[in-house]
Amino acid sequence: MKTPVELAISGMQTLHVQHRGRSGYRVKVRPSYVDETLFGSPAGTRPVPPDFDPPWMKKANRSRGVGTGVSQALGANGSCESTSSSGSTPTLTPRKKNKYRLISHTPSYCDESLFGSRQEGAGWEAKWMARGDAAKLHALFWTPPATPRGSHSPRPRETPVRCVHPADLSKTEHRVMASSRRLSVDGLDTPRPLRRERSHSLTHPNVPSTGHTPASSPCTSGPRDPRPAPSGVTFRSPLVTPRAGSVSVSVPTTPRQGGATQKTKPPWK
């Protein structure tokens, strides 16, 4: 009967034999890039990964780099099946030869901002374009004109902008004062004329908002006195402004059509 020590020694020997067999089997497997990066190279020699050149590299540099990469890969892996020359791509490299790949790459604005300025000899014309058409090419830096041109413009460029003449404002004031005076003569006691006066606030800036009706204002048939009342009351009729007094002098031109002439006293006398 074996002692526990002998049993332990024999178990260790069997485990060692199994480990030898498994390790010898794993050496024959071709190492992948995942196993090398995670667990290291089993044989101690790691093949050089393929280098990817940018498309604007010259053809001589790319062929030289491919040749050195192929020689190193063949030296590291003796069991490689590809026995082709150094110019051809090996089976280990994932890059394949593509006939549509750009060899002479013309740098764009993105390439200039990322990888430097543009080359001196690079042109913007295509190979199938004529020389006359290539001379017409220019960069697309276009901004719209500041003013519209042609018939779509609302105003020609030669005609200046017309400004509002002060005489037009005086005519509108005459018209507004005549209409408001006609309403006050008709005897409308509703606060509607006040609302009308408020709507013409641009022509009457000094009109205060009061609750009195125009019937409480002084006599509308005679000439108005632009001077304030002797009492200290700050109330002012909507029509007794300095501007309204000056306008009311020139307004009574309509009674002349009836034949009776009315002479008004100027406000400065």
From Swiss-Prot:
- Where in this protein would one find the motif Nuclear export signal, according to its record? 5-17
Q: What is its main location?
A: cytoplasm
| Keywords, alphabetical | Cytoplasm, Cytoskeleton, Neurogenesis, Notch signaling pathway, Nucleus
Region annotated Interaction with RBPJ/RBPSUH sits at: 128-156
A GO-annotated cellular component: cytoplasm
State where the protein is found.
Cytoplasm; Nucleus; Cytoplasm, Cytoskeleton, Microtubule organizing center, Centrosome
**S-S bonds:** none
Query: InterPro entries given for it?
Result: RITA1
Asked if Nucleus is a keyword of the record, the answer is yes
Biased amino acid composition, Polar residues: 202-220, 247-269
Q: Where is this motif: Nuclear localization signal?
A: 92-108
Spell out the Low complexity composition-biased ranges. Answer: 79-93
List GO molecular-function terms, semicolon-separated.
tubulin binding
Set out the biological process GO terms recorded for this chain's protein: negative regulation of Notch signaling pathway; neurogenesis; Notch signaling pathway; nuclear export
**Entries under Pfam families matching the protein:** RITA
Function noted in UniProt: Tubulin-binding protein that acts as a negative regulator of Notch signaling pathway. Shuttles between the cytoplasm and the nucleus and mediates the nuclear export of RBPJ/RBPSUH, thereby preventing the interaction between RBPJ/RBPSUH and NICD product of Notch proteins (Notch intracellular domain), leading to down-regulate Notch-mediated transcription. May play a role in neurogenesis.
Can you state the subunit structure given in the record? Interacts with RBPJ/RBPSUH.
Q: Which PANTHER family match?
A: RBPJ-INTERACTING AND TUBULIN-ASSOCIATED PROTEIN 1
Family that this chain belongs to: Belongs to the RITA family.
Q: What is this protein called?
A: RBPJ-interacting and tubulin-associated protein 1
Task: State the organism of origin.
Answer: Bos taurus (Bovine)
Organism classification: Eukaryota, Metazoa, Chordata, Craniata, Vertebrata
Q: Which gene encodes it?
A: RITA1
